[in-house]
């Protein structure tokens, strides 16, 4: 009985097996373009941030709430690109919620090329809605510069998520 069913419907079942993955292709190509940088730094650009004599463009990789990453907690991905004139001068760039106490606590480091760097920032569940995102840049000459931007400007989706979580306003 099963053999008869297979012989009768095998063509239709095989065509269906070929067509089902085609439904996922648009999302695949959109993600591939995002990770390649064809669609910009990320889904949502936060803008240009002046950090001392240098500047960088900051963007959220995905315009969504932070994702739970196991024991590490909730994480949010940011991308950045250094300005043309400062690419050779900047040694490291760090990102953190709240003002860093020192360079040792500067936050998560951006990795990648100066044209497209990425960082996974931990987002504590009790972060205040008026928190600031601090960017620390260290030069090859030892110079260190810091700047901040409101988290609400850098990631409105994170602020919305924090208010749903019960973060303090």
Mark where each language-model region is.
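A short, sequence-level motif marking secondary-structure junctions
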Residues: 62-64, 111-114, 150-155
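Structured, soluble extracytoplasmic/luminal domains of envelope-associated proteins
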Residues: 79-127
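N-terminal Lys/Arg-rich, disordered targeting/topogenic segments
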Residues: 1-6
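Transition segment at domain starts
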Residues: 31-75, 105-111
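Hydrophobic membrane-insertion alpha-helices, especially the h-region
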Residues: 8-29
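Short, conserved beta-strand segments of beta-strand-rich sandwich/propeller modules, principally
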Residues: 130-134
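Short acidic/polar inter-strand loop motif in beta-rich domains
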Residues: 139-146
């Amino acid at each position: 009985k099963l053999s008869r069913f297979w012989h009768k419907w095998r063509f239709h079942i095989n065509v269906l097996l070929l067509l089902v993955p085609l439904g996922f292709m648009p999302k695949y190509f959109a993600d591939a373009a995002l990770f390649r940088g064809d669609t910009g730094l990320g889904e949502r650009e936060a803008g240009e941030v002046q950090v001392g004599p240098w500047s960088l463009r900051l963007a959220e990789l995905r315009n969504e709430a932070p994702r739970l990453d196991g024991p590490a907690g909730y994480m949010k991905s940011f991308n950045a690109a250094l300005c043309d004139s400062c690419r050779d001068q900047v040694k490291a760039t760090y990102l953190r919620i709240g003002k860093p106490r020192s360079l040792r606590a500067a936050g998560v480091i951006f990795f990648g090329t100066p044209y497209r760097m990425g960082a996974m920032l931990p987002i504590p569940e009790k972060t205040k809605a008026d928190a600031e995102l601090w960017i620390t840049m260290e030069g090859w000459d030892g110079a260190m510069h810091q700047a901040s931007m409101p988290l609400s400007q850098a990631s409105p989706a994170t602020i919305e998520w924090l208010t749903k979580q019960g973060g303090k306003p």
